[in-house]
C-alpha cells in the first residue's frame, strides 16, 4: 500500500535532553562563527545553560556581525525576554479555545496533533506586514493545556502565513515542548542554508507552501513553487506540506508522483465536504494517497465543512482517504483555529478573534471516521512518528 519515500532523519532523543554534547550547542562553535572568533565564544556557547533548544540555535539561524560579536543580537534579546513571559507561568491567557467535550475513546500512547500554530505576543513576535489577517495570541502553555485534555503527547507546530518567512514563533513553540515537538517552516528562495541547518537542529522536518490563505488557485503557480521548494529540501530528508485547493492538487499531480521528497496536503487536501466524493480533483488526491507518495492531514474539519459541531458531511471524505491508504493519513486540530478570512470592513492589520472550536468534540469524530483502534493508532502515532521522526 505504501510507495517508496525518502527515509526520515533519525533523531537521537539525547539531542533534546540538552547534554553538554548537544549538537545545538556544538553548532554554535562549529557553524555560527568564523574560526577567528571561535576561541572567544565557544566556551560560552557550550557551557551556558541557556544555549539550548531552538533558542540555542538562533545564532546559527540569524548570524552575527562583527559589531555584535560580544553581545546578544536584538533578536536573541527578544527571544530571551519572551522566555520569561511565555514560560514563566503567566496567570492570564489569550482567547484560544480549550476543549469543552471530554474525549470518548482511548487515545494511544504517543499520539500526535499534527497541525497547530503558535501566535506569540506581537511585541515579541511581530507579524509580517503583508499578512491577510491578524490573529489573537495563542501561547505554548495554552497549547499544552489543550493537549493534556486531549491526551496528545506529541505536537507538530506549523508556521502560519501571518509571519511570512519568520519562523521564530514556531521555533519558540518547539523549544517549549522539547522532545515531543516538531516543526514545519516557511521559507523562500532567499532563506540561507544556515537557517535551514539551524531549523533542522531545532526540530523542523518540512516546509509549508500556503497557497490557500492568499487565494492562489493557479496550478501553474503551484508547479513553479513546488519545484523550487523540492530542490531546497530534498537533501535534508524533509517534506513539503501544502495548503491548497483540489484544483492545484490535480495540476501538480505528476510532480507529486515524481517528487524527490514526501508531500503532505493540509486539511483534507482542500476538499469541500458539501461537494461530496465526486467533486473535481478528489479522485486525483485519492490516487496520490494510494500510491504512497502523499500524506493527507484530516485536520481542521471546519475548514472543509460548515456543519458544526460534528461536521458529519466530512465523514465520507475522511473515510475515503483512510480507505485509500491508512498509512498515509495523519490527524490535527488546527489549533488555535485562526480565522484567516478578515471580516468585511476590517483591515488585515486589525485583530480578528480566533474561532472557538471544541477540539474534544472534533477529536471524537476520528472514532466515527475510523472505527478500528489499530487504524486510529496508525493515524495518531505510527504515521506521525515516521513522517516527523519522533
Regions found by a protein language model. Name each.
Residues 9, 31, 49-72:
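N-terminal secretory signal peptides
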Residues 16, 56-58, 91-112, 116-119:
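C-terminal segment of N-terminal export signals and the immediately downstream linker at the start
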Residues 112-116, 155-157, 183-185, 207-209, ...:
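Hydrophobic faces of well-ordered beta-strands that scaffold small-molecule active sites
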Amino acid at each position: 500500500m505504501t510507495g517508496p519515500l525518502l527515509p526520515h532523519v533519525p533523531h537521537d532523543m539525547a539531542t533534546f535532553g540538552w547534554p553538554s554534547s548537544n549538537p545545538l550547542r556544538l553548532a554554535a562553535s562549529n557553524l555560527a562563527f568564523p574560526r577567528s572568533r571561535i576561541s572567544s565564544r565557544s566556551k560560552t556557547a557550550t557551557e551556558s545553560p541557556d544555549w539550548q533548544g531552538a533558542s540555542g540555535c538562533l545564532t546559527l539561524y540569524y548570524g552575527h556581525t562583527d559589531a555584535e560579536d560580544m553581545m546578544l543580537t536584538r533578536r536573541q534579546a527578544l527571544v530571551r525576554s519572551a522566555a520569561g513571559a511565555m514560560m514563566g507561568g503567566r496567570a492570564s491567557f489569550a482567547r484560544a479555545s480549550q476543549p469543552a467535550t471530554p474525549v470518548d475513546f482511548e487515545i494511544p500512547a504517543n499520539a500526535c496533533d499534527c497541525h497547530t500554530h503558535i501566535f506569540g505576543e506581537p511585541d515579541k513576535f511581530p507579524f509580517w506586514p503583508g499578512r491577510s489577517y491578524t490573529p489573537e495570541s495563542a501561547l505554548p502553555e495554552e497549547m499544552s493545556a489543550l493537549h493534556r485534555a486531549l491526551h496528545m503527547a506529541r505536537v507538530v507546530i506549523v508556521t502560519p502565513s501571518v509571519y511570512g518567512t519568520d519562523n521564530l514563533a514556531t521555533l519558540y513553540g518547539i523549544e517549549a515542548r522539547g522532545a515531543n515537538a516538531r516543526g514545519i517552516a516557511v521559507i523562500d528562495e532567499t532563506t540561507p542554508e544556515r537557517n535551514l541547518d539551524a531549523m533542522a537542529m531545532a526540530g523542523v522536518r518540512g516546509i509549508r507552501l500556503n497557497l490557500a490563505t492568499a487565494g492562489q488557485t493557479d496550478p501553474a503557480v503551484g508547479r513553479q513553487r513546488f519545484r523550487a521548494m523540492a530542490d531546497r529540501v530534498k537533501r535534508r530528508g524533509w517534506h513539503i506540506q501544502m495548503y491548497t485547493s483540489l484544483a492545484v492538487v490535480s495540476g501538480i499531480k505528476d510532480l507529486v508522483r515524481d517528487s524527490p521528497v514526501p508531500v503532505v496536503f493540509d486539511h483534507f487536501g482542500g476538499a469541500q465536504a458539501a461537494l461530496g466524493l465526486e467533486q473535481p480533483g478528489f479522485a486525483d488526491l485519492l490516487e496520490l494517497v494510494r500510491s504512497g507518495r502523499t500524506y493527507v492531514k484530516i485536520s481542521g474539519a471546519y475548514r472543509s465543512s460548515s456543519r458544526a459541531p460534528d461536521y458529519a458531511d466530512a465523514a465520507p471524505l475522511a473515510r475515503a482517504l483512510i480507505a485509500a491508504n491508512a498509512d498515509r493519513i495523519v490527524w490535527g486540530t488546527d489549533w488555535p483555529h485562526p480565522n484567516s478570512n478578515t471580516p468585511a470592513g476590517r483591515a488585515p492589520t486589525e485583530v480578528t478573534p480566533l474561532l472557538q472550536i471544541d477540539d474534544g468534540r472534533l477529536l471524537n469524530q476520528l472514532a466515527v471516521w475510523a472505527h478500528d483502534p489499530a487504524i486510529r493508532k496508525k493515524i495518531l502515532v505510527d504515521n506521525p512518528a515516521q513522517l516527523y521522526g519522533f
